[in-house]
A protein has these predicted regions:
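Structured helix-beta-strand junction loops
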Residues: 27-28, 63-64, 109
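Active-site-proximal, substrate-binding regions of enzyme catalytic domains
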Residues: 42, 48-49, 54-67, 72-74
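Acidic active-site catalytic centers that drive phospho-/nucleotidyl reactions
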Residues: 4, 40, 99
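Short, well-structured N-terminal submotif of metal-dependent ribonuclease cores
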Residues: 1-33, 46-59
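Active-site neighborhoods of divalent-metal-dependent phosphate/nucleic-acid chemistry enzymes
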Residues: 67-110
């Protein structure tokens, strides 16, 4: 299961759908997130936690044994393609920057 920033943030700030997300995570054989997704999540969480959220993110990655996917040139190519096919102003899906990164990670991870 590839995690995106919205799912990670939802879980860590305890949004109403976090229990459902945690259940899906528990059922997944592997959990992974692209390295840029972790940065995006940390940046959003810093607003919620009023400061440095790296420790929170690092604990989440450790606790759930999340595989961190490096973001390569191939990821860039797939993410850019996703933007031009499904990005804001291009398609009803309106994928944003983080969405395109998660899409690329999912596509290239199989």
């Amino acid at each position: 299961m590839i995690l995106d920033a919205s799912a990670i943030v939802s879980i860590l700030i305890g949004e109403p759908d976090s229990a459902r997300l945690l259940q899906h995570m528990a059922e997944a054989p592997v959990l992974a997130a692209a390295a840029p997704t972790l940065l995006e999540s940390t940046m959003v969480l810093s607003r919620h936690f009023k400061g440095d959220a790296r420790a929170v993110m690092n604990e989440f990655v450790r606790e759930f044994q999340i595989e961190v996917i490096p973001f390569s040139r191939d990821h860039y190519d797939v993410a850019a393609d996703a933007f031009y096919r499904f990005g804001k102003g291009q398609h009803a899906a309106s994928l944003n920057f983080g969405d395109c990164m998660s899409y690329a990670a999912a596509r290239l991870s199989g």
